[in-house]
Amino acid sequence: MLFRSAIPGLPQKSGKVRDVFDLGDKLLMVVTDRISAFDVILPCGVPDKGKVLNQLSLFWMEFFGMKNHLVTANVDEYPAELKPYKEDLRGRSMLVKKVKMVEVECIARGYLTGSGWKEYQKSGTVNGMKLREGYENASKLDEVLFTPTTKAAIGDHDEAINFAETVQLVGEKTAALLRDTTVSLYSKAADYARERGIIIADTKFEFGLDADGSLILADEVLTPDSSRFWPVSSYAVGKNPPSLDKQYVRDWLDSINFNHQPPGPVLPDDVISRTREIYLKAFKDLSGREIV
């Protein structure tokens, strides 16, 4: 298990799960086995989680064929200065181009659940958009919704923004491109996943901008950390389906009345073990592969 990575001499920034090292013209992204919930990094890791996130992101980048920030994920092709760390990096890292990241998190919702369901119950809206009456928890939406948020610093919460606010942040052309690309990628992935027995209820994409203004798919793509995955076999409208994602950990934390503030509690061994099983199953069901 890798909870924290360190490469002496290289500038480093750490997110909730990823450690990013600056190599000058490129970045090394290392996906650790850390896990966060409710924007709180928990003090224990989940073995193989980082490998699942990294390798599933690589799978989807290949699947979409869209321009992305990947240079290589083959550690044998990494710069010589990384050679001493090769085995720690294998399977859980990628070398990527530096791109100008768009400061909007792009969420696609195909089903009404989570915060969207809570808002709909109160006001009949999701992200301020009025929806028809009659939806239940976990209902499939009539159309895929684009519900962007701001990008918050670690420990802070992302704030939902509407399309007009997205335009104010990034301009009308880029906002429309973010919306259309997010919905298109989600729809393509959702059709594929359903054939593999998984419903993608919602997911989050992040994009960068190339020098010519075109979008680049970046960061993580359709992982159990950034998505809600439901088995088709146990899906039913009106109740929360069991999930193949981080929801299992969130539910356990709520069951012990965790207040969603740091420090987070240590997860029991059985919760860690079950979380690992969930992540590995999501990877295998979606990709048809085993992690390496």
Where are the regions a protein language model picked out?
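Surface-exposed helix-capping loop/turn segments at secondary-structure junctions
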Residues: 66-70, 188-200, 213, 287-292
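A long amphipathic alpha-helix within ATP-dependent nucleotide-binding catalytic cores
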Residues: 170-201
